[in-house]
Each structure stands twice: as structure tokens, then as C-alpha cells.
């Protein structure tokens, strides 16, 4: 694994992708578990044969990708479906993310994991954890605008995730993303310099 791994997480609508992109602009590597999940469930993705075998051909679209609407209905209708889905996807995501962290040539890697706080496996991989934070009212507003969901739908998703307090308690560092872009950039730039220093210290200590 790359010498220094920074786990990045935050609640839905917190702006994780925006912050991850800012770190990449500064020179960090990025391993995004959501992107890996999409890759695995795209047409020809490594998870598709197992998903079709487990859930039937209806979970695939005509081009062979996972039909997210169909899978979402199955998961809501049958509590065991989520466990079975995660049993197929999660080992593959863990394997690929570990391989990509190891292969990264950057001074440090941002490992973006939406449910990092809920997952002991990913937390153990990280040298630091940075949480993207904003008021819960702003999370709801952003997701409603982005995804066309109702406030109740967004609140239901938030209720299934770690609480804001739990995420902040797990954080080594916090990036506040409350719509002030200049402040956001300044926070990421300062953390980037800190992570470069910590990465160099770790390399030196391991020599």
C-alpha cells in the first residue's frame, strides 16, 4: 500500500467529491470506492456474473450493467438482499482499493469511502481520517437539488449512516464545506502540506 493513506469521508451531500478533487489538484492520488463500485457493476464489470447468478437476469440492463433501480427495489423489499449484494461487492471493492493504494505513485493517497466511519476494515488502512462536514440542513438542501429527492427521503438516507457527531469523533482532520469556496480551498491546501510532511516522516521512519 502507498506509504501514507488519508481516508476521506462525510455524510451524503457534504461535498466529498469536491474536496477529493481539490486534493487531486494539489497532487494527491485518489482511490474512490464509489467509483470502483460503479466500475464493478458496469457492463462487463467483474461483479456482474455473480450479481446475475444471485439475483437473476432482471438486475442487468440490456447492455449488461447493473440496473440500479431494480436492485434498489430488491434491497428495499428484502432486507437480506442488501447483505447478499454487499457480500458480492465489498470483497471486490476492498481488494481493488488496496491494490490501487499500493500502486499509487503520489506522495500520499486519498482513499474516499462514504461509509468509512462505519467500516473497521477501511479505518485500519488509514494513517489519517479527514471528514468533510457541513450543517445537516445544507446536506438535505444539496441532495434535494442534486437528486430530486424529498427532504424525508434524504433524511432516511442520513438516518442509515453514521451521525455527524460519530464522524467528527472519528476524524483526525475536518474540512468545513459550507459553500465558501475560498475557505474550502485554503483548508485543503493546508492539509495537503501537512500530509506531505507526515508522508515524508513516515517514509524516513521506515528506511
UniProtKB/Swiss-Prot annotation:
Catalysed reaction equations from the record: 3'-dephospho-CoA + ATP = ADP + CoA + H(+)
Annotated GO MF terms: ATP binding; dephospho-CoA kinase activity
EC number(s) given by UniProt: 2.7.1.24
Gene Ontology CC annotations of this record: cytoplasm
Chain positions recorded as ATP binding sites: 13-18
Classification via PROSITE patterns: DPCK
InterPro entries: Depp_CoAkinase, P-loop_NTPase
Subcellular location(s) per record: Cytoplasm
Predominant localisation class: cytoplasm
Pathway assigned in UniProt: Cofactor biosynthesis; coenzyme A biosynthesis; CoA from (R)-pantothenate: step 5/5
Role, per record: Catalyzes the phosphorylation of the 3'-hydroxyl group of dephosphocoenzyme A to form coenzyme A.
NCBIfam families per UniProt: dephospho-CoA kinase (TIGR00152)
Protein name: Dephospho-CoA kinase
Organism name: Dechloromonas aromatica (strain RCB)
